[in-house]
Amino acid sequence: MKKLYIKTFGCQMNEYDSGKMADLLHADEGMVMTDRPEDADVVLLNTCSIREKAEDKVFSDLGRLRELKKTKPNLLIGVGGCVASQEGQQIVSHAPYVDVVFGPQTLHRLSDLIAKRRETGLFQVDISFPEIEKFDHLPASRQTRGSAYVSIMEGCSKYCSYCVVPYTRGEEVSRSFDDVLTEVAGLASKGVKEIVLLGQNVNAYLGKMGDRQEIADFALLIEYIVEIPGVERIRFTTSHPKEFTQRLIDVYTKVPKLVSHLHLPVQHGSDAMLSAMKRGYTALEFKSIIRKMRAVRPDLTLSSDFIVGFPGETEADFEKLLKMVEELNFDNSFCFIFSPRPGTPAANLHDDTPYEVKLKRLQTLLALVESQANQISQKMLGNIERVLIEGLAKDGINLQGRAENNRVIHFTAPAQNIENLIGQMVDIRITEVLNYTLRGKLVEAYVH
């Protein structure tokens, strides 16, 4: 039986795509996954180009795979994702031992590309943008319990000045309303309890409803999904403040299964920086969204993405960012120093801020966010949290799962119950706060 190894870089969209690659090659060629590239017949790197560091890791991994291919000449190496979309033929020029290069929108052609490589002996490159065709050619997910990603749209039409996504994944295109509901219903019928809706700007969703001329927005989609039997929890990522409508806020008042955790990237707290980034909203408008959300969900936890050291960022700009973070009380968030990406407008902006200053600002921001996150964790001590069990923790002994606020929680369960608990919702009493996780005890009477 042929074995497949996939290494995934970057966002949840890439994780979803990697799962689809595995499903596709299992359906077409009977391939099974391995966690060791040395044992694989096919190795795929699903890449991310959002920051230079992630891109560098890909080429570092390719260097190691070159050595592996010397010992396994029949090993097939494929590069997919956003670096593949951005670099295309250059990947093969840089690493001629790569066999297949494919973009996010052509992963459904992966089996054909592999077959052509084997038949012709020629490397294959397909980084075209056939809109959302791939969803018509991918097999159903094999996920049977727990949580599952469902991609509802692809691409981005916002063109923020620093971001490569519109160039690597194309413009925004939504899947049809009926297709999304069919996929969700199929997953729920197999035992999946939590649905995570995915898109680069997921709340910009506008899906065609059957043969009608009507279009469903994101709020309506959620209202329909919650009615599907078996769906117990709904999340979504990543949303954009510009598309965070009052209709979507109103859904939070009607759909308790929509979690009280929101990841909403703000990027900065200074209007000057937000304008330079071409984000399309002001700091005040972002704050207004959060205040409205907390009015309908007082227990809402908020995480975000932040960029420091953007070209032109002054100390006053940075202080405005810190003030916003203090005011809105963010949970665990992603904080980065600006990474200029080739082909984006921001890459050409004059940047005279020393790296040491940027690094100090990053450390200051991280300390503030981590302090706020720790306070949120401390407030959970003694609480009983509804937790969806994902599987064994890294120690191989404890189980781990996620609470509604996306916190990872570890707990011990009797050995004979472990397999039965995976994929289930259970109630856990929080007993200890660690650096990045919580520990708790299973409340025996409350297994759902």
From Swiss-Prot:
Catalytic reaction(s) noted: N(6)-dimethylallyladenosine(37) in tRNA + (sulfur carrier)-SH + AH2 + 2 S-adenosyl-L-methionine = 2-methylsulfanyl-N(6)-dimethylallyladenosine(37) in tRNA + (sulfur carrier)-H + 5'-deoxyadenosine + L-methionine + A + S-adenosyl-L-homocysteine + 2 H(+)
Domain MTTase N-terminal span(s) in chain numbering: 2-119
Gene Ontology CC terms, in alphabetical order: cytosol
Any one GO molecular function term: metal ion binding
InterPro entries: Elp3/MiaA/NifB-like_rSAM (IPR006638), Methylthiotransferase (IPR005839), Methylthiotransferase_CS (IPR020612), Methylthiotransferase_N (IPR013848), Methylthiotransferase_N_sf (IPR038135), MiaB_methiolase (IPR006463), rSAM (IPR007197), rSAM_horseshoe (IPR023404)
EC number of the protein: 2.8.4.3
Pfam families named in the record: Radical_SAM, TRAM, UPF0004
Record-annotated TRAM domain positions: 378-444
Entry superkingdom: Bacteria
Keywords attached to this entry: 4Fe-4S, Cytoplasm, Iron, Iron-sulfur, Metal-binding, S-adenosyl-L-methionine, Transferase, tRNA processing
Cell compartment(s), UniProt: Cytoplasm
Record-annotated Radical SAM core domain positions: 142-377
Cofactor binding, per record: Binds 2 [4Fe-4S] clusters. One cluster is coordinated with 3 cysteines and an exchangeable S-adenosyl-L-methionine.
Protein residues bound to [4Fe-4S] cluster 2: 156, 160, 163
Known cofactor(s): [4Fe-4S] cluster
Transcription found in the keyword field: no
Keyword match Iron-sulfur: yes
Summary of subunit composition and partner proteins: Monomer.
UniProt function note: Catalyzes the methylthiolation of N6-(dimethylallyl)adenosine (i(6)A), leading to the formation of 2-methylthio-N6-(dimethylallyl)adenosine (ms(2)i(6)A) at position 37 in tRNAs that read codons beginning with uridine.
Family as reported in the entry's similarity comment: Belongs to the methylthiotransferase family. MiaB subfamily.
PANTHER family reported in the protein's UniProt record: CDK5 REGULATORY SUBUNIT-ASSOCIATED PROTEIN 1 (PTHR43020), MITOCHONDRIAL TRNA METHYLTHIOTRANSFERASE CDK5RAP1 (PTHR43020:SF2)
HAMAP family membership: tRNA_metthiotr_MiaB
Record-given protein name: tRNA-2-methylthio-N(6)-dimethylallyladenosine synthase
Organism: Polynucleobacter necessarius subsp. necessarius (strain STIR1)
Taxonomic lineage: Bacteria, Pseudomonadati, Pseudomonadota, Betaproteobacteria, Burkholderiales
GN (gene name): miaB
